[in-house]
Amino acid sequence: MALCGSSKGRGRGRPIQRKVVVCGDGACGKTSLLNVFTRGFFTQVYEPTVFENYVHDLYIDDQLVELSLWDTAGQEEFDRLRSLSYAETHVIMICFSVDNPTSLENVESKWLDEILEYCPGVKLVLVDSKCDLRDDPAVLDRLQRYGTHTDQYEEGLGVARRIRASRYLECSSKHNRGVNEVFLRGRARVTVHSIRQGSAGSCCVM
């Protein structure tokens, strides 16, 4: 499967449009992940997102795919607004952060329930978006005081298996490590599946 191969044969036909919604707890790194991938920059200032949409093109097997990337708010006060983002979604990426164990717990206790309500059968990708903090001394000290620890790879992988995610991936938006792989190995692979299966798996919010 050629993701970024030669341009020979490209430009033929109309682009295939696919929608990807990114969800997860507030401050878990969703916006930074999208900013680094689509715009190439990381901001140190945290500003809660209400709603934002990105468009990014890539080639899959010489087919131009236009990804519509939807960044959503994780706070409870935006639950109703966020539910409107799920219409006609092909892939949902659930993000969590290793420095906030609750964000991983909420993948199963909150986000999966919401997704099953609005998008039953949609393809899932689980992403740890701040893996650089796993061994951060300040983070380790803070969590130790609360009697907990940073989420480990095996824990994230276990959650991914239980929610039947298509992929589990880790990245560091701050250091731009693994960001492209998240999109090319995660979304692109699932997107290829949805292309070959037609529109199956997309959501309809009533």
UniProtKB/Swiss-Prot annotation:
Lineage of the organism: Eukaryota, Fungi, Dikarya, Basidiomycota, Agaricomycotina
Name of this chain's protein: GTP-binding protein Rho3
UniProt family annotation: Belongs to the small GTPase superfamily. Rho family.
The gene coding this protein: RHO3
GO terms classed as biological process: small GTPase-mediated signal transduction
GO molecular function, one term: GTPase activity
Species in which this protein is naturally found: Schizophyllum commune (Split gill fungus)
Gene Ontology CC annotations of this record: plasma membrane
Keyword Glycoprotein tagged: no
Matches recorded under NCBIfam families: small_GTP
